[in-house]
Amino acid sequence: MPYKISRAAYAGMFGPTTGDKVRLADTELFIEIEKDFTTYGEEVKFGGGKVIRDGMGQSQVTRADGAVDTVITNAVIVDHSGVYKADIGLKDGRIVAIGKAGNPDMQPGVNIIVGPGTEAIAAEGKIVTAGGMDSHIHFIAPQQIEEALMSGMTCMLGGGTGPAHGTLATTCTPGPWHLARMIEAADAFPMNLAFAGKGNASLPGALTEMVLAGATSLKLHEDWGTTPGAIDCCLSVADEYDVQVMIHTDTLNESGFVEDTIGAIKGRTIHAFHTEGAGGGHAPDIIKICGQPNVIPSSTNPTRPYTVNTIAEHLDMLMVCHHLSPSIPEDIAFAESRIRKETIAAEDILHDIGAFSIISSDSQAMGRVGEVAIRTWQTADKMKRQRGRLKQENGDNDNFRVRRYIAKYTINPAIAHGLSHEIGSVEVGKRADLVLWNPAFFGVKPDMVLLGGSIAAAPMGDPNASIPTPQPVHYRPMFASYGRSLTNSSVTFVSQASLDAGLKGRLGVAKQLVAVKNTRGGISKASMIHNDLTPEIEVDPETYEVRANGELLTCEPATVLPMAQRYFLF
């Protein structure tokens, strides 16, 4: 006779199930479990007196015969594809199955075999997401990588060589020699890394040699001269070698206006950084390119979301990041032309309607590398409070809004940069780069970060204590952050052309080099999941007011945010 159990007792034992709701951190965002792929009465759980024991939930199946390396039990999966409950099976560093784990000799419907060689990660009451991807990195300091990892990022793409002045301002690793040094350095870090070459040139030769040296993308930056000629040349090289182009346009409109940039792009796919403009770009109307079907627009996190402190903070950041002087009037005018409350307010709404597709950091160069997830969810929370539920919601929950916003730092940057065959979602066949969260700390402080199926980072107590929990508890590197486990748990992304040219043998690096693919004509704004809207944008040149399809986009700045001081008092 089946035993009946209350929802509260069930959630306490196995985590929430279909129809249960979970609050994300201290936001006003509530998810509802859409489907539970586990089987009532046959759930697997590890621990004393629990199910994953020999002859019960654990089978006699060997690894060679199909048992997984790791099972993550009873996880609430939050992904662009949905909000659902399942067990997750990992093998050879990849997700091999999502569904029902256990012993097929004893239990029905098992598609994840637990054997004597299987490790268990208990996710009852926890949320599992794909590791985040930050697609706007200035590699100024290697210490950024640990900060990003501990915040739930598992892939970083950008450029730089350290605290050189070119890197402080622009996201470029210029030239084959510097690219080689950065790819070599990548072997030291528990993180999937990808490097962008400099894209500013009017002739293709120097750009081609950077792609052949391993650049996964080319970055056009106004500080190097983003002229129509450089834009056209860079995109032509990218089309030839299947790499992405990122653009930071001409704030001063010296070589042309936004219309000239759109003309130089010629309908080709391009990733537009900080499309609102505070991070740089044609003043005051670069934001209008988010309506172009070939432009993938993104934000950097200092303007996310619009608050009472945003404007004042940006002026100081800008002076430092772009080597400007407060004693030079022209430099002050340059800074003030970029910081506009009207376009920043509109950016909030453009994210909420799915017209802006990606959120990234702009690490140490007008952005905070450890706050990509936090700023994304703060924006989502602000928009729910100010604009209410989205019309696409089905039921009394925020599932669609949550799926829209998580796509902005997982699957969409992966698609934009040709990495979605490897990362970006909780999906069978992809790398097991996964993050576990306590719902109360969702988006703020992860419970555990996995890279390639191995634990790379987690909060950990005093190593001399008798149990793992005594203070001081803080984030520490785990075993996938050391030795050959590090180089076997993460990869370095490069261009296919560089692999064909023998880059791996030439550099002798330990990490696997994986090629990016499908970054050009095969993708566009329409490829951005839940974030593919292309409204017609108008900007008033006098007032800076922004309209989308004729509707004024404006909102009040936030005075209080969730996921903030409450979580960082200690």
Swiss-Prot record:
<dbReference type="InterPro" id="IPR017950">
    <property type="entry name" value="Urease_AS"/>
</dbReference>
<keyword id="KW-0533">Nickel</keyword>
<comment type="pathway">
    <text>Nitrogen metabolism; urea degradation; CO(2) and NH(3) from urea (urease route): step 1/1.</text>
</comment>
<feature type="binding site">
    <location>
        <position position="221"/>
    </location>
    <ligand>
        <name>substrate</name>
    </ligand>
</feature>
<keyword id="KW-0479">Metal-binding</keyword>
<feature type="binding site" description="via carbamate group">
    <location>
        <position position="219"/>
    </location>
    <ligand>
        <name>Ni(2+) 1</name>
    </ligand>
</feature>
<dbReference type="InterPro" id="IPR006680">
    <property type="entry name" value="Amidohydro-rel"/>
</dbReference>
<dbReference type="InterPro" id="IPR017951">
    <property type="entry name" value="Urease_asu_c"/>
</dbReference>
<dbReference type="InterPro" id="IPR032466">
    <property type="entry name" value="Metal_Hydrolase"/>
</dbReference>
<keyword id="KW-0963">Cytoplasm</keyword>
<feature type="binding site">
    <location>
        <position position="248"/>
    </location>
    <ligand>
        <name>Ni(2+) 2</name>
    </ligand>
</feature>
<dbReference type="GO" id="GO:0009039">
    <property type="term" value="F:urease activity"/>
</dbReference>
<dbReference type="GO" id="GO:0043419">
    <property type="term" value="P:urea catabolic process"/>
</dbReference>
<protein>
    <recommendedName>
        <fullName>Urease subunit alpha</fullName>
        <ecNumber>3.5.1.5</ecNumber>
    </recommendedName>
</protein>
<dbReference type="InterPro" id="IPR050112">
    <property type="entry name" value="Urease_alpha_subunit"/>
</dbReference>
<dbReference type="InterPro" id="IPR011059">
    <property type="entry name" value="Metal-dep_hydrolase_composite"/>
</dbReference>
<dbReference type="GO" id="GO:0005737">
    <property type="term" value="C:cytoplasm"/>
</dbReference>
<keyword id="KW-0378">Hydrolase</keyword>
<dbReference type="InterPro" id="IPR005848">
    <property type="entry name" value="Urease_asu"/>
</dbReference>
<feature type="binding site">
    <location>
        <position position="362"/>
    </location>
    <ligand>
        <name>Ni(2+) 1</name>
    </ligand>
</feature>
<feature type="binding site">
    <location>
        <position position="136"/>
    </location>
    <ligand>
        <name>Ni(2+) 1</name>
    </ligand>
</feature>
<feature type="binding site">
    <location>
        <position position="138"/>
    </location>
    <ligand>
        <name>Ni(2+) 1</name>
    </ligand>
</feature>
<dbReference type="InterPro" id="IPR011612">
    <property type="entry name" value="Urease_alpha_N_dom"/>
</dbReference>
<dbReference type="GO" id="GO:0016151">
    <property type="term" value="F:nickel cation binding"/>
</dbReference>
<feature type="active site" description="Proton donor">
    <location>
        <position position="322"/>
    </location>
</feature>
<dbReference type="Pfam" id="PF01979">
    <property type="entry name" value="Amidohydro_1"/>
</dbReference>
<comment type="subunit">
    <text>Heterotrimer of UreA (gamma), UreB (beta) and UreC (alpha) subunits. Three heterotrimers associate to form the active enzyme.</text>
</comment>
<feature type="binding site" description="via carbamate group">
    <location>
        <position position="219"/>
    </location>
    <ligand>
        <name>Ni(2+) 2</name>
    </ligand>
</feature>
<feature type="binding site">
    <location>
        <position position="274"/>
    </location>
    <ligand>
        <name>Ni(2+) 2</name>
    </ligand>
</feature>
<feature type="domain" description="Urease">
    <location>
        <begin position="131"/>
        <end position="570"/>
    </location>
</feature>
<comment type="similarity">
    <text>Belongs to the metallo-dependent hydrolases superfamily. Urease alpha subunit family.</text>
</comment>
<dbReference type="InterPro" id="IPR029754">
    <property type="entry name" value="Urease_Ni-bd"/>
</dbReference>
<dbReference type="Pfam" id="PF00449">
    <property type="entry name" value="Urease_alpha"/>
</dbReference>
<feature type="modified residue" description="N6-carboxylysine">
    <location>
        <position position="219"/>
    </location>
</feature>
